[in-house]
């Protein structure tokens, strides 16, 4: 397939989906990552189209691979069919032996809270899921806050997740742990197995297709997707 044919496939994807991703102002187009000359034409077309739609390089690559697999699975390229089949993203059902302890399918209101006092207030008010996001470099303060948060939810039925501080969470017996992508990359060898074998639930933050696929490979209890809307809490 020549460059003109690839450009035709790219244009077909853009025509079918540009409105879908326009939003209020639309996302700015991203540079198309370089590819090998022998790359699959559908992959090349989808990579360029997804970059034009505003997907960053890793997400455009993940989508392009999914589009290539989708076309192979269906036996034809369909520009109107946005990839959504798990197998096209290389995903499969987790092996129960490697999965983390499960959470309810519906976690309800998920209120990210700055300290143990807020955790207690929201748990007593009936908020079902209360993640503690306590930011500090002081190990003593971290352990004190985590232990206080665990005590604060006793008898309320609230599910307490500890953000980032996984060792303190294990020590205090928290319901679950939540980590971001950077924390996932920084975990020491054996940390995931320690969390898994303890029966503690694990949640992982994601912000796009590539990170969701990466998180899925860990078989966590749940995967969080955000920020859907702009946030002032951290730089995204």
Question: Could you describe each region identified by the protein language model?
Answer:
Residues 191-195:
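Short amphipathic alpha-helix with an adjacent loop that forms part of the alpha/beta core around
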Residues 1-175, 197-204, 215-221:
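Conserved N-terminal beta1-alpha1 strand-loop-helix module at the mouth
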């Amino acid at each position: 397939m020549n460059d003109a044919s690839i450009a035709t496939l790219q244009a077909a994807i853009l025509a079918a989906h540009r409105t879908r991703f326009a939003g209020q102002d639309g996302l700015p187009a991203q540079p198309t990552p370089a590819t090998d000359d022998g790359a699959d034409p559908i992959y090349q077309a989808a990579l360029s189209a997804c970059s034009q739609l505003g997907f960053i390089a890793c997400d455009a690559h993940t989508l392009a691979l999914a589009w290539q697999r989708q076309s192979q699975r269906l036996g034809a390229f369909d520009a109107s069919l946005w990839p959504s089949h798990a197998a096209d993203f290389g995903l499969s059902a987790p092996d129960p032996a490697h999965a983390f302890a499960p959470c309810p399918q519906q976690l309800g209101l998920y209120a990210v809270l700055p300290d143990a006092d807020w955790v207690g207030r929201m748990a007593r008010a009936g908020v079902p899921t209360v993640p503690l996001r306590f930011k500090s470099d002081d190990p003593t303060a971290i352990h004190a806050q985590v232990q206080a948060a665990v005590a604060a939810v006793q008898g309320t039925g609230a599910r307490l997740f500890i953000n980032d501080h996984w060792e303190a969470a294990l020590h205090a017996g928290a319901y679950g742990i939540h980590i971001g992508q950077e924390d996932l990359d920084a975990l020491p060898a054996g940390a995931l197995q320690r969390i898994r074998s303890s029966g503690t639930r694990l949640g992982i933050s994601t912000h796009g297709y590539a990170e969701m696929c990466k998180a899925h490979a860990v078989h966590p209890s749940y995967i969080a997707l955000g920020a859907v809307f702009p946030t002032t809490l951290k730089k995204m």
